[in-house]
Amino acid sequence: MCDQLSQFVVDKYVHLKDFLAKESCAELTAELKRLVAEKQTTQDSQCPKSEAVHGAMAFDKLLVDLLPHFERASGRRLYPTYSYARLYAPGEDLTIHTDRPSCEISATLTLGFEGDVWPIYMGDEGKANANKIDMVVGGAVLYRGMDKHHWRETYTEGK
């Protein structure tokens, strides 16, 4: 069993470093900022300070393009359900939670940021014994969304 698959099976998540090319990340970041500028985004109750978009064409395409890579890392046949992109604002946090059934296996990718790295945390039972994962541009975490508690502390940097 490959290292990524082993980690996913045992830990219920795998950190995929250098997963997406920096050029692709820059293009997708520019697309998200364009959607924000054109007011094609919204806020949600989970992160009300931030702008988000559900089902944008560029991110839906990314979901399909990355599917085979996520299937290899998880050892499972996966069915894409939806894409969701968010431009986090300073002062935002992501409250500890698990995901709904349509997010049985989820991925988070970092496409761009200003300032310091903003980690995501993965834990089994709340915040005790959680793992901090530094998310750099091009990095991803594939995880069992209904099983892994995940969150981000307050974001103090730029966007």
Language-model-detected regions and their locations in the chain:
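Conserved active-site beta-strand element of glycosyltransferases/polysaccharide synthases
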Residues: 87
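A short coil-to-beta-strand element that immediately follows conserved catalytic motifs
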Residues: 75-84
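Secondary-structure boundary/capping signal
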Residues: 24, 40, 77-78, 93, ...
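Generic beta-strand or strand-like secondary-structure segments
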Residues: 65-69, 84, 106
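Non-heme Fe(II)/2-oxoglutarate
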Residues: 1-74
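Short helix-to-loop capping/linker segments positioned immediately adjacent to catalytic or ligand/cofactor-binding
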Residues: 73, 92-96, 152-153
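Catalytic core of non-heme Fe(II) oxygenases with the double-stranded beta-helix
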Residues: 90-147
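Ligand-binding loop in jelly-roll beta-barrel domains
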Residues: 148-159
